[in-house]
Structure formats: structure tokens, C-alpha cells
Amino acid sequence: MSSFQSSDSRVSEELRTISSNVRQLSDEITKLRPQQGGSISIVECVDRALAGVFQTLGDVRGLLDRGRTLSKQAKILSGLNYDERPVRYESIPVAHQNMFQWAFQDLQENSEKPEHTDARLMTWLREGSGTFWVSGKPGSGKSTFMKFLADSPNTASALRSWASKKAIVIATHFFWSAGNAIQKSDEGLLRSILFNVLDQCPDLIPKVLQQMWARAGANQEPYQRPSSSPSLTRSELETAINTLKTQLDLPVRFCFFIDGLDEYSGDHYILEAVSVYGGQRLRVR
């Protein structure tokens, strides 16, 4: 909502500037009318004032277009999001500060023991590709570890080595068998991944969700807070993921952290569709 309010305020300011410029133009013309032989000065004054007005009008048009874009983006992100999405994540306890620091030990400390999980994890974050799996007994803290990794600045730092000059986008999903249907389904997974990615990269929305983008713009006034969001079908969610996978020339790289696969009740080909990602990596346990 703050984006809409900010843009609306800027438009109001620009409109006040236009009014001021028009009044100034009127005043200048009034002053010059009594002058003899002042026609050239009048024309020059009018040209300068009108140039300022037209520039301001162009700025306002740009702001209006930006407002429409922000409104459409908000509609679509609202349509992807769902109330239960953060529930499982928020229920997982935060790890003690030093509990999992072993995961970020320098590789040199484990050079003689390459089989260690921490060494392999750091290698994967910095240089690897494909899927890195973490397994363990029920109640052993796997979800807490996953939450810790996804949130740790050390993870982002290691991924930057892999991404080189590209930006890093981290997306997460936490399956939950104790939750409702969407919290343990592939629909929840697809919505979470798409929401996380497009919330951080909103400029991708028109490419990834073309039909939804068109529907979101129907009869939409600038700066109108979205009252309803376009609905997505299962087919559209799958198409969006597949479309995202084809965007290989992006200035970003993605890392997905998916927790609780043993609590997943959907079709496993969806997991394969998400994980087989050209030039990207998926992080699951």
C-alpha cells in the first residue's frame, strides 16, 4: 500500500507544479502585454513556460503508468499468496546463534574430511549445481536447520560466489503434514515459489504470468488498491514455473529451499519440474 500512497503523493505534487507553471505563464504574459515591440519576448517567454509544462506532463504520464504497473503487480502477488503460506515457517523455532555455525566452517578446515556434510554443503553453495539433500530422523531439527540456512547471511554470501555478478533470489517452501490441504500439496509449493521469486523480481511478472497480467490490468485505475486478485488454475501455475525455467538470460540466479518432502502429498513430477532448472539450483531436504 505504501507504494501506491507514495506514487499518489508524487502525482499530486506534479499536478501542483503544473498549476504553478500555468499561473506563472499567465502572469508573464500579462506583464508583457503593455510593452511596445515586446512580441519576440512574449513568444520566448511562452515557449520556455510551455516547455516546462510539457515536461511536467510527461513526468506525470510516467508516474501514472508506474502506478498502473504497481497496482497490477500487487494484484498478481496477492493472487499467488495464501494465508497459510508463512504459518509453518513461523512455527519453526529459531536456531540458537551457535547451533548450526558448523555448517559455515571454512572448507580448509575440512580438507582432510571431504565427506563431512558441512564441507559438501559449502562446496555446493559456492560452486555446485543441482540438488543438495539433507535427511535425518524425525524430530532431529531438520526444519530448524533449513530455516536457519534460508535466513542466514552466510548462505547469501556463499551463494554470491556462485552467482558471480548476478543477484541472488532465495525462495522457500515448508511442507506441513499437520496443516490443511494447501500446506502439503504441490499447489502450495508452486504458489510459494512463484510468490517468493516474483515478489523479489516483479519485472518478471508479465513474462511469467502473461494471461494473469492481462486480466489484472482489465478496468484497473491507477493507484486503486486491489480489491480482488485474478485467480490461477493449476495449469497456469505449472505453465508459470515452466516459463520461469526458460528465462535463462536473467540478471539473477535462484536458490530454492524446500523443507518437509516427507510430508508432501502431491505428485512428485512437480518436484522434478521445479528442480530441473537450467543454470539454477534447488535446495531441498
Which stretches of residues belong to each language-model region?
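Conserved NB-ARC/NACHT P-loop NTPase core of NLR-like innate immune receptors
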Residues: 1-285
